[in-house]
Curated annotation (Swiss-Prot):
Record has Transmembrane as a keyword: no
InterPro entries: Aldolase_TIM, TIM_sf, TrioseP_Isoase_bac/euk, Triosephosphate_isomerase, Triosephosphate_isomerase_AS
GO cellular component, one term: cytosol
Protein name per Swiss-Prot or TrEMBL: Triosephosphate isomerase
Taxon lineage: Bacteria, Bacillati, Chloroflexota, Dehalococcoidia, Dehalococcoidales
Source species of the chain: Dehalococcoides mccartyi (strain ATCC BAA-2100 / JCM 16839 / KCTC 5957 / BAV1)
Location (main, coarse): cytoplasm
UniProt binding sites for substrate: 9-11, 169, 209, 230-231
Length: 253
């Protein structure tokens, strides 16, 4: 069984002091949870202080975005080399980046290549809009997004997060069977794009209104290897509960 990954995406939430308080409130409990990969992705400004708080910890850090150039006249951007000193993971291609900042499949592809070049592990997000889901276009959209994102890459493993846009922040998660079916299709596309070996080793996460009440059902599905958690990752008790339930499932195998 692939190792379960639970990643908390804090989005544009928490001041510096709030971020440190949140980490402090769940650090000890999270460190007791074994067998899964635990990742928190705070805003950029909190990465360094949280890194110092998590020194020698089993909790990993991730960024929420990056730019694809190493350095230069790109006002306001953060480069892969800057992030490499602070974290291990980076979220790329989140639907909010695509919607609000115009990120295209080509840009996502450039960012993935830049992250890998710097030694960062990308968490690549894909997912369909509400109208695409209603029109039966989910598979077509996922295939297009994946092939654009992975164009020109020869990888043995890549982390993918399936986040149906209609489920993000709405409280309306995809049913476990819907998520499992979509992720099964993603794995098939990975097989066509990167080869069967990569498809079998690549963890595929589900994201979209994940909470402590639905995580066990989600992770009990055959194709789902973890979760990208939004709002629930901002509550220490909820995030710890999600990780604890994930570890129970992991340790059964």
């Amino acid at each position: 069984m692939r190792q379960i990954i639970i990643a908390g995406n804090w989005k544009m939430n928490t001041t510096l002091s709030e971020a440190c308080t949140l980490v402090q409130s769940m650090k000890c409990e999270l460190e007791r949870i074994e067998g899964i990969e635990k990742i928190i992705c705070p805003p950029f400004i909190s990465l360094y202080p949280i890194k110092t708080m998590l020194e020698n910890s089993s909790i990993k850090l991730g960024a929420q975005n990056l730019f694809y150039q190493e350095k230069g006249a790109y006002t306001g951007e953060i480069s892969p080399l800057m992030l490499k000193e602070l974290c291990q993971y980076v979220i790329i291609g989140h639907s909010e980046r695509r919607a609000y900042f115009g990120e295209t499949g080509q840009v996502v592809n450039q960012k993935i290549k830049a992250a890998l070049q710097a030694g960062l592990l990308p968490i690549v997000c894909v997912g369909e809009k509400p109208e695409e889901n209603e029109n039966g276009q989910t598979r077509q959209v996922l295939e297009t997004q994946l092939k654009e994102a992975l164009d020109g890459l020869n990888l043995s493993c890549i982390i993918i997060a399936y986040e149906p846009i209609w489920a993000i922040g709405t409280g309306k998660a995809a049913t476990a069977s819907e998520a499992n079916s979509a992720i099964g299709y993603i794995r098939r596309v990975l097989g066509d794009t990167l080869g069967n070996a990569a498809a079998q080793t690549s963890p595929i996460l589900y994201g979209g209104s994940v909470n402590e009440k639905n995580i066990t059902e989600i992770l009990s599905q055959t194709n789902i290897d973890g979760a990208l958690v939004g709002g629930a990752s901002l509550k220490a008790e909820s995030f710890v509960s999600i990780c604890r339930q994930a570890a129970v499932i992991q340790n059964k195998h």
